Regions:
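Short phosphate-binding loop-to-helix
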Residues: 77-87
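Conserved "HGTGT" condensation-loop signature of ketosynthase/thiolase-family condensing enzymes
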Residues: 1-76, 89-94, 101-121
Length: 121
């Protein structure tokens, strides 16, 4: 593959937005991922790499039916996904994968007002 021939081909958000206490982070990952795949006309069988932070990328791949050759779980805060893009480009250019899904799923608004974990009140 020639350098510079990597492209972002699909992008999407989850179908529902806002306060979503009835949907898990994994479900939000999956919903956004399926919407992104639909945006570019591919399915889980076309993806051979996955990258995400916070949630386990292997669990997300399994949930979506993806069998990855490449997995990136780099988590460094809010810029994790920009690092995933750079890692994905390097993985594709080196032949480690052909199509890499970068996903995120979280509804921080759903946790507003909730008691933090480990706090007894």
């Amino acid at each position: 593959m020639k350098p510079g021939s990597v492209a972002v081909v699909g992008a999407a958000e989850s179908t529902e937005l806002g306060k979503l206490p009835h949907i898990s982070n994994t479900q939000l990952h999956a919903d956004a991922a399926l919407n992104a795949m639909a945006d570019c006309g591919i399915g889980p069988g076309d993806i051979d790499g996955i990258a995400t932070a916070r949630e386990n990328p292997i669990e997300i791949a399994h949930y979506l039916g993806i069998k990855p050759r490449y997995v990136d779980g780099t988590g460094v805060g809010g810029c994790s996904f920009m690092i995933h893009v750079r890692h994905a480009v390097a993985a594709i250019e080196s032949g480690m994968a052909n199509t890499i899904l970068i996903t995120h799923g979280e509804s921080g608004r759903s946790q507003v007002g909730m008691t933090p974990r480990g706090v007894n009140m």
